[in-house]
């Protein structure tokens, strides 16, 4: 997901965050500048991200050490992908009920389709929910929808 005529692909940040410590060095001086843009770019409801909420969300990324810890997730993606490939090669899929929760204005059904096609033994056991008018930040943008969906799934 690089750059297209529509702009950068949705996953551009995966490579950026995982490439050594460049992202940490660039972002650490002004995490508010970067993350305010980043959060709003992936939001379906941009107006809910007030300066106060943004400050609360950005604080955990406010130092270089915190950024390094956070971006460790992206650095581990290569190992995770290799582990998933090995499991799938041995036909190891989820056999328990599973849930995929996404936002309509986020990745919509992209990950749901992938999960259904690759990672679950019985696609009928996958509870797939796309929250309407919601971007990537599900809990901030649609707390009621998340709570309702999780409760329905967990307390069947």
List the model feature ranges, each with a label.
Residues 1-130, 151-152:
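Flexible "cap/lid" subdomain of the alpha/beta-hydrolase fold that forms the substrate-access gate
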């Amino acid at each position: 997901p690089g750059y297209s005529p529509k702009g950068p692909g949705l996953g551009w940040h995966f490579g950026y965050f995982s490439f050594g410590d460049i992202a940490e060095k660039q972002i650490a001086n002004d995490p508010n500048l970067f993350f305010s843009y980043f959060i709003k770019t992936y939001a379906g409801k941009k107006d809910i991200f007030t300066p106060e909420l943004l400050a609360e969300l950005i604080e955990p990324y406010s130092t270089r050490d915190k950024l390094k810890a956070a971006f460790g997730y992206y650095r581990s993606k290569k190992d995770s992908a290799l582990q998933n490939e090995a499991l799938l090669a041995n036909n190891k899929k989820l056999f328990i009920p599973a849930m995929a929760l996404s936002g309509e204005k986020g990745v919509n059904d992209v990950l749901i389709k992938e999960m259904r096609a690759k990672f679950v033994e019985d696609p009928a056991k996958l509870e797939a929910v796309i929250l309407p008018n919601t971007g990537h930040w599900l809990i901030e943008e649609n707390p009621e929808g998340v709570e309702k969906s999780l409760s329905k799934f967990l307390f069947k």
